[in-house]
A protein has these predicted regions:
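ABC ATPase NBD coupling module
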Residues: 62-79, 103
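Internal alpha/beta loop-helix hairpins
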Residues: 180, 190-260
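Catalytic Walker B motif of ABC-type/P-loop ATPase nucleotide-binding domains
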Residues: 154-158
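Conserved ABC ATPase signature
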Residues: 129-133, 137
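A short, proline-enriched helix->beta-strand linker immediately N-terminal to the Walker B motif
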Residues: 148-152
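Glycine/charge-rich catalytic "coupling/switch" loops of P-loop NTPases
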Residues: 261-308, 325, 329-366
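Conserved ABC ATPase "signature" region
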Residues: 60-65, 108-125, 176-177
Length: 366
Protein backbone atom coordinates (compact mmCIF):
# COMPACT_ATOMS: atom_id res chain seq x y z
CA UNK A 1 0.00 0.00 0.00
CA UNK A 2 1.23 3.49 -0.89
CA UNK A 3 -0.23 6.04 1.53
CA UNK A 4 0.34 9.73 0.89
CA UNK A 5 -0.99 12.76 2.76
CA UNK A 6 1.13 15.84 2.12
CA UNK A 7 1.07 19.62 2.01
CA UNK A 8 3.57 21.68 0.03
CA UNK A 9 3.02 25.40 -0.49
CA UNK A 10 5.03 27.67 -2.74
CA UNK A 11 4.29 31.12 -4.21
CA UNK A 12 1.44 30.74 -6.68
CA UNK A 13 0.70 27.07 -5.98
CA UNK A 14 -0.35 24.84 -3.11
CA UNK A 15 -0.37 21.04 -3.13
CA UNK A 16 -2.62 19.40 -0.55
CA UNK A 17 -3.05 15.79 -1.61
CA UNK A 18 -4.05 12.58 0.12
CA UNK A 19 -4.53 9.13 -1.36
CA UNK A 20 -4.02 5.46 -0.55
CA UNK A 21 -3.50 2.89 -3.29
CA UNK A 22 -2.81 -0.87 -3.25
CA UNK A 23 0.53 -2.23 -4.39
CA UNK A 24 1.85 -3.67 -6.65
CA UNK A 25 0.29 -2.25 -9.80
CA UNK A 26 0.32 1.07 -11.62
CA UNK A 27 -1.05 4.08 -9.75
CA UNK A 28 -1.86 6.78 -12.31
CA UNK A 29 -1.73 10.44 -11.31
CA UNK A 30 -4.01 11.99 -13.90
CA UNK A 31 -4.83 15.63 -14.48
CA UNK A 32 -4.25 18.64 -16.66
CA UNK A 33 -0.87 20.35 -16.95
CA UNK A 34 -0.25 22.37 -13.81
CA UNK A 35 -2.49 20.24 -11.60
CA UNK A 36 0.38 19.23 -9.31
CA UNK A 37 1.29 15.79 -10.63
CA UNK A 38 5.04 16.37 -10.93
CA UNK A 39 5.14 18.24 -7.62
CA UNK A 40 3.49 15.25 -5.96
CA UNK A 41 5.90 12.66 -7.39
CA UNK A 42 8.85 14.86 -6.44
CA UNK A 43 7.58 14.92 -2.85
CA UNK A 44 7.14 11.13 -2.90
CA UNK A 45 10.68 10.68 -4.22
CA UNK A 46 12.16 13.02 -1.62
CA UNK A 47 13.50 15.44 -4.26
CA UNK A 48 11.06 18.00 -2.83
CA UNK A 49 10.26 18.32 0.86
CA UNK A 50 6.70 18.32 2.20
CA UNK A 51 5.81 21.20 4.51
CA UNK A 52 3.56 18.81 6.42
CA UNK A 53 2.27 15.27 6.17
CA UNK A 54 3.44 11.70 5.84
CA UNK A 55 4.28 9.10 3.20
CA UNK A 56 4.27 5.36 3.83
CA UNK A 57 5.18 2.54 1.47
CA UNK A 58 4.06 -0.93 2.52
CA UNK A 59 3.98 0.24 6.14
CA UNK A 60 7.43 1.83 6.18
CA UNK A 61 7.56 5.55 6.94
CA UNK A 62 9.40 7.61 4.31
CA UNK A 63 8.18 11.00 5.52
CA UNK A 64 6.52 12.04 8.76
CA UNK A 65 6.89 15.74 9.46
CA UNK A 66 5.41 15.50 12.95
CA UNK A 67 7.93 12.86 13.98
CA UNK A 68 10.76 14.59 12.14
CA UNK A 69 11.27 11.63 9.78
CA UNK A 70 12.53 12.31 6.25
CA UNK A 71 14.35 9.36 4.71
CA UNK A 72 17.06 10.70 2.35
CA UNK A 73 16.48 10.29 -1.38
CA UNK A 74 19.32 7.80 -1.80
CA UNK A 75 17.93 5.54 0.92
CA UNK A 76 14.32 5.45 -0.28
CA UNK A 77 15.00 2.89 -3.02
CA UNK A 78 12.76 4.76 -5.43
CA UNK A 79 13.49 4.75 -9.16
CA UNK A 80 12.59 7.82 -11.22
CA UNK A 81 12.09 8.10 -15.00
CA UNK A 82 11.64 11.63 -16.33
CA UNK A 83 10.01 13.02 -19.49
CA UNK A 84 13.44 13.12 -21.11
CA UNK A 85 15.64 10.05 -20.77
CA UNK A 86 18.61 11.88 -19.18
CA UNK A 87 21.08 9.23 -20.33
CA UNK A 88 24.82 9.75 -20.09
CA UNK A 89 25.88 10.66 -23.66
CA UNK A 90 29.45 9.37 -23.23
CA UNK A 91 28.26 5.87 -22.19
CA UNK A 92 26.74 3.21 -24.40
CA UNK A 93 23.52 1.44 -23.45
CA UNK A 94 25.35 -1.15 -21.37
CA UNK A 95 27.17 1.59 -19.46
CA UNK A 96 23.97 3.49 -18.78
CA UNK A 97 22.27 0.33 -17.52
CA UNK A 98 25.26 -0.62 -15.34
CA UNK A 99 25.09 2.82 -13.74
CA UNK A 100 21.71 1.81 -12.36
CA UNK A 101 23.35 -1.25 -10.80
CA UNK A 102 25.91 0.98 -9.06
CA UNK A 103 23.10 2.99 -7.47
CA UNK A 104 21.57 -0.22 -6.09
CA UNK A 105 24.42 -0.64 -3.60
CA UNK A 106 23.46 -3.42 -1.16
CA UNK A 107 19.73 -3.39 -1.99
CA UNK A 108 18.05 -6.79 -2.41
CA UNK A 109 17.94 -7.75 -6.07
CA UNK A 110 14.51 -7.32 -7.62
CA UNK A 111 15.56 -7.86 -11.22
CA UNK A 112 18.82 -8.77 -12.97
CA UNK A 113 20.66 -7.22 -15.92
CA UNK A 114 19.78 -9.95 -18.43
CA UNK A 115 16.11 -9.90 -17.43
CA UNK A 116 15.93 -6.13 -17.91
CA UNK A 117 17.58 -6.36 -21.32
CA UNK A 118 15.14 -9.08 -22.42
CA UNK A 119 12.03 -7.50 -20.93
CA UNK A 120 12.71 -4.13 -22.58
CA UNK A 121 14.01 -5.52 -25.88
CA UNK A 122 17.45 -3.89 -25.60
CA UNK A 123 19.76 -6.69 -26.77
CA UNK A 124 20.53 -5.16 -30.18
CA UNK A 125 21.25 -1.71 -28.71
CA UNK A 126 23.75 -2.55 -25.97
CA UNK A 127 26.79 -1.09 -27.76
CA UNK A 128 25.04 2.02 -29.08
CA UNK A 129 25.35 5.53 -27.67
CA UNK A 130 22.20 7.51 -26.79
CA UNK A 131 22.56 9.69 -29.91
CA UNK A 132 22.18 6.55 -32.04
CA UNK A 133 18.80 5.66 -30.48
CA UNK A 134 15.27 6.84 -31.19
CA UNK A 135 13.33 8.67 -28.50
CA UNK A 136 11.39 5.54 -27.63
CA UNK A 137 14.56 3.46 -27.41
CA UNK A 138 16.17 6.03 -25.10
CA UNK A 139 13.16 5.89 -22.78
CA UNK A 140 13.40 2.10 -22.65
CA UNK A 141 17.04 2.41 -21.60
CA UNK A 142 16.03 4.95 -18.94
CA UNK A 143 13.44 2.47 -17.67
CA UNK A 144 16.06 -0.26 -17.56
CA UNK A 145 18.53 1.92 -15.68
CA UNK A 146 15.86 2.79 -13.10
CA UNK A 147 14.92 -0.88 -12.69
CA UNK A 148 18.53 -1.92 -12.15
CA UNK A 149 18.74 0.40 -9.15
CA UNK A 150 16.52 -2.30 -7.55
CA UNK A 151 13.68 0.05 -6.56
CA UNK A 152 10.76 -0.88 -4.37
CA UNK A 153 8.78 1.91 -6.09
CA UNK A 154 9.16 3.29 -9.62
CA UNK A 155 8.07 6.85 -10.46
CA UNK A 156 7.33 7.60 -14.12
CA UNK A 157 6.80 11.32 -14.79
CA UNK A 158 5.09 11.49 -18.19
CA UNK A 159 7.73 9.24 -19.78
CA UNK A 160 5.95 9.33 -23.16
CA UNK A 161 5.16 13.06 -23.29
CA UNK A 162 8.12 13.94 -25.53
CA UNK A 163 7.44 11.11 -28.00
CA UNK A 164 5.37 11.19 -31.17
CA UNK A 165 2.45 8.78 -31.54
CA UNK A 166 4.49 6.06 -33.25
CA UNK A 167 7.20 6.08 -30.57
CA UNK A 168 4.58 6.21 -27.82
CA UNK A 169 2.93 3.08 -29.23
CA UNK A 170 6.38 1.48 -29.35
CA UNK A 171 7.00 2.00 -25.61
CA UNK A 172 3.53 1.23 -24.21
CA UNK A 173 3.81 -2.58 -24.61
CA UNK A 174 7.01 -2.53 -22.55
CA UNK A 175 5.26 -0.62 -19.76
CA UNK A 176 2.49 -3.23 -19.88
CA UNK A 177 5.14 -5.95 -19.60
CA UNK A 178 6.63 -4.29 -16.51
CA UNK A 179 3.19 -4.08 -14.91
CA UNK A 180 2.32 -7.67 -15.72
CA UNK A 181 5.60 -9.43 -14.95
CA UNK A 182 7.17 -7.50 -12.07
CA UNK A 183 5.98 -6.95 -8.51
CA UNK A 184 7.35 -3.39 -8.45
CA UNK A 185 4.64 -0.79 -7.79
CA UNK A 186 4.69 2.20 -10.14
CA UNK A 187 3.35 5.74 -9.97
CA UNK A 188 2.62 6.88 -13.53
CA UNK A 189 2.05 10.57 -14.29
CA UNK A 190 0.00 11.41 -17.37
CA UNK A 191 -2.48 13.86 -18.85
CA UNK A 192 -3.47 11.36 -21.57
CA UNK A 193 -6.44 9.27 -20.47
CA UNK A 194 -5.84 6.59 -23.10
CA UNK A 195 -2.52 5.82 -21.38
CA UNK A 196 -4.26 5.64 -18.01
CA UNK A 197 -6.95 3.35 -19.43
CA UNK A 198 -4.36 1.03 -20.91
CA UNK A 199 -1.90 0.86 -18.01
CA UNK A 200 -3.36 1.80 -14.65
CA UNK A 201 -4.79 -0.37 -11.90
CA UNK A 202 -5.61 2.63 -9.66
CA UNK A 203 -6.26 6.28 -10.60
CA UNK A 204 -5.82 9.51 -8.64
CA UNK A 205 -7.47 12.55 -10.27
CA UNK A 206 -5.67 15.82 -9.55
CA UNK A 207 -6.86 19.37 -10.17
CA UNK A 208 -5.24 22.56 -8.84
CA UNK A 209 -3.20 20.62 -6.29
CA UNK A 210 -6.16 18.72 -4.84
CA UNK A 211 -7.33 15.12 -5.22
CA UNK A 212 -10.77 15.14 -6.88
CA UNK A 213 -11.29 11.37 -6.88
CA UNK A 214 -9.37 8.12 -6.54
CA UNK A 215 -9.99 4.41 -6.93
CA UNK A 216 -9.87 1.54 -9.43
CA UNK A 217 -10.02 2.60 -13.09
CA UNK A 218 -13.56 1.31 -13.64
CA UNK A 219 -14.88 3.28 -10.65
CA UNK A 220 -13.12 6.54 -11.46
CA UNK A 221 -14.31 6.35 -15.08
CA UNK A 222 -17.87 6.88 -13.80
CA UNK A 223 -17.07 9.87 -11.59
CA UNK A 224 -18.39 13.27 -12.74
CA UNK A 225 -15.07 14.86 -11.76
CA UNK A 226 -13.40 13.03 -14.65
CA UNK A 227 -15.55 14.81 -17.24
CA UNK A 228 -14.28 18.18 -16.04
CA UNK A 229 -10.77 17.06 -17.01
CA UNK A 230 -11.23 14.97 -20.17
CA UNK A 231 -14.28 16.74 -21.63
CA UNK A 232 -17.53 15.15 -22.83
CA UNK A 233 -16.17 13.15 -25.77
CA UNK A 234 -13.94 10.89 -23.64
CA UNK A 235 -16.45 10.12 -20.89
CA UNK A 236 -17.43 6.47 -20.73
CA UNK A 237 -17.56 3.32 -18.66
CA UNK A 238 -14.51 1.07 -18.31
CA UNK A 239 -15.37 -2.63 -18.34
CA UNK A 240 -13.30 -5.78 -18.01
CA UNK A 241 -14.16 -9.16 -19.48
CA UNK A 242 -12.86 -12.39 -20.99
CA UNK A 243 -12.61 -13.21 -24.69
CA UNK A 244 -14.90 -16.18 -25.40
CA UNK A 245 -14.80 -16.21 -29.21
CA UNK A 246 -12.46 -14.74 -31.80
CA UNK A 247 -13.22 -14.01 -35.45
CA UNK A 248 -9.84 -13.01 -36.91
CA UNK A 249 -11.20 -12.68 -40.45
CA UNK A 250 -13.57 -9.91 -39.38
CA UNK A 251 -11.38 -8.50 -36.61
CA UNK A 252 -14.03 -9.05 -33.95
CA UNK A 253 -14.35 -10.94 -30.69
CA UNK A 254 -17.03 -11.85 -28.16
CA UNK A 255 -16.31 -10.56 -24.69
CA UNK A 256 -18.02 -11.96 -21.59
CA UNK A 257 -18.78 -8.92 -19.42
CA UNK A 258 -20.86 -9.31 -16.28
CA UNK A 259 -23.83 -11.51 -17.13
CA UNK A 260 -23.78 -10.59 -20.81
CA UNK A 261 -21.69 -10.71 -23.97
CA UNK A 262 -20.34 -7.84 -26.07
CA UNK A 263 -19.09 -8.10 -29.63
CA UNK A 264 -16.05 -5.82 -29.90
CA UNK A 265 -13.48 -4.82 -32.48
CA UNK A 266 -10.36 -6.75 -31.46
CA UNK A 267 -7.56 -8.67 -33.16
CA UNK A 268 -4.68 -10.92 -32.11
CA UNK A 269 -6.00 -11.63 -28.61
CA UNK A 270 -6.37 -15.34 -27.76
CA UNK A 271 -9.58 -16.82 -26.40
CA UNK A 272 -9.48 -16.73 -22.61
CA UNK A 273 -7.61 -13.42 -22.45
CA UNK A 274 -8.77 -10.72 -20.05
CA UNK A 275 -9.51 -7.42 -21.75
CA UNK A 276 -10.18 -3.90 -20.51
CA UNK A 277 -12.63 -1.94 -22.64
CA UNK A 278 -13.88 1.64 -22.65
CA UNK A 279 -17.39 2.24 -23.96
CA UNK A 280 -17.59 5.94 -24.73
CA UNK A 281 -20.90 7.45 -23.64
CA UNK A 282 -21.21 9.24 -26.99
CA UNK A 283 -21.22 5.85 -28.80
CA UNK A 284 -24.06 4.32 -26.76
CA UNK A 285 -27.57 4.48 -28.24
CA UNK A 286 -30.77 3.90 -26.27
CA UNK A 287 -34.10 2.46 -27.41
CA UNK A 288 -37.27 1.84 -25.45
CA UNK A 289 -38.28 -1.09 -27.71
CA UNK A 290 -36.34 -3.94 -29.37
CA UNK A 291 -34.87 -2.74 -32.67
CA UNK A 292 -34.45 -4.90 -35.77
CA UNK A 293 -32.69 -4.45 -39.09
CA UNK A 294 -29.73 -2.44 -37.78
CA UNK A 295 -26.02 -2.95 -38.38
CA UNK A 296 -25.37 -2.41 -34.66
CA UNK A 297 -23.97 -5.68 -33.30
CA UNK A 298 -24.84 -5.22 -29.62
CA UNK A 299 -28.41 -4.79 -28.36
CA UNK A 300 -28.42 -5.34 -24.61
CA UNK A 301 -31.34 -5.40 -22.18
CA UNK A 302 -30.67 -2.70 -19.58
CA UNK A 303 -32.18 -0.73 -16.73
CA UNK A 304 -31.86 3.02 -16.20
CA UNK A 305 -30.37 3.63 -12.74
CA UNK A 306 -29.72 7.39 -12.78
CA UNK A 307 -30.09 10.46 -14.99
CA UNK A 308 -28.07 13.66 -14.64
CA UNK A 309 -27.19 16.76 -16.63
CA UNK A 310 -23.56 17.14 -17.65
CA UNK A 311 -21.60 20.38 -17.87
CA UNK A 312 -22.08 20.70 -21.62
CA UNK A 313 -25.87 20.84 -21.99
CA UNK A 314 -26.37 17.11 -22.55
CA UNK A 315 -27.68 14.30 -20.34
CA UNK A 316 -25.76 11.36 -18.89
CA UNK A 317 -27.86 8.23 -18.42
CA UNK A 318 -26.44 5.57 -16.12
CA UNK A 319 -27.46 2.01 -17.00
CA UNK A 320 -27.25 -1.42 -15.43
CA UNK A 321 -26.27 -3.80 -18.23
CA UNK A 322 -26.01 -7.37 -16.96
CA UNK A 323 -24.63 -6.21 -13.64
CA UNK A 324 -22.17 -3.74 -15.18
CA UNK A 325 -22.56 0.04 -15.31
CA UNK A 326 -22.60 1.76 -18.71
CA UNK A 327 -23.03 5.47 -19.51
CA UNK A 328 -24.97 6.96 -22.41
CA UNK A 329 -24.77 10.63 -23.43
CA UNK A 330 -27.96 11.89 -25.07
CA UNK A 331 -29.57 15.26 -25.77
CA UNK A 332 -32.25 16.90 -23.67
CA UNK A 333 -34.64 16.44 -26.62
CA UNK A 334 -33.91 12.70 -26.72
CA UNK A 335 -34.55 12.41 -22.99
CA UNK A 336 -37.93 14.10 -23.37
CA UNK A 337 -38.87 12.01 -26.42
CA UNK A 338 -37.95 8.72 -24.72
CA UNK A 339 -39.53 9.83 -21.41
CA UNK A 340 -36.80 8.05 -19.48
CA UNK A 341 -36.90 7.67 -15.71
CA UNK A 342 -34.78 5.66 -13.26
CA UNK A 343 -36.06 2.09 -13.18
CA UNK A 344 -37.11 2.05 -16.85
CA UNK A 345 -36.18 -0.95 -18.98
CA UNK A 346 -34.36 0.04 -22.19
CA UNK A 347 -32.19 -1.45 -24.91
CA UNK A 348 -28.57 -0.34 -25.01
CA UNK A 349 -27.10 -0.38 -28.52
CA UNK A 350 -23.34 -0.35 -29.14
CA UNK A 351 -21.53 -0.70 -32.47
CA UNK A 352 -18.71 -3.22 -32.34
CA UNK A 353 -16.60 -0.89 -34.50
CA UNK A 354 -16.94 1.90 -31.93
CA UNK A 355 -14.73 -0.10 -29.55
CA UNK A 356 -11.76 -0.05 -31.95
CA UNK A 357 -8.76 1.49 -30.21
CA UNK A 358 -10.49 1.32 -26.82
CA UNK A 359 -9.86 -2.34 -25.90
CA UNK A 360 -6.62 -3.59 -24.33
CA UNK A 361 -5.42 -6.98 -23.20
CA UNK A 362 -4.66 -7.43 -19.49
CA UNK A 363 -2.48 -9.98 -17.77
CA UNK A 364 -4.29 -12.34 -15.44
CA UNK A 365 -3.06 -10.45 -12.41
CA UNK A 366 -3.73 -6.91 -13.63
Amino acid sequence: MLQVSVLRTRPGFSLEASFAAPTPGIIALFGRSGSGKTTLVNVISGLSVADAGDIRLDGEVLTDTRAGVAVPVERRRIGYVFQDARLFPHLNVTGNLRYGEKRARAAPQVIGFDEVVTLLGLTQFLQRRPRELSGGERQRVALGRALLSQPRLLLLDEPLASLDLARREEVLPYLEALRDHLAIPMVYVSHQFDEVLRLATHVVLLEAGRVLAQGPVNEVSLRPELQSIVGPDLVGAVLEGVVTRLDPDNGSADLAVGRGTLQVSLRDVPVGSRVRLQLLARDVILATQPVQGLSVRNALASTVTAISNDDYGAVLVRLDVGGETVLARITQNALQALKLRPGDAVWTLVKAVSTRGHAFRLASGA
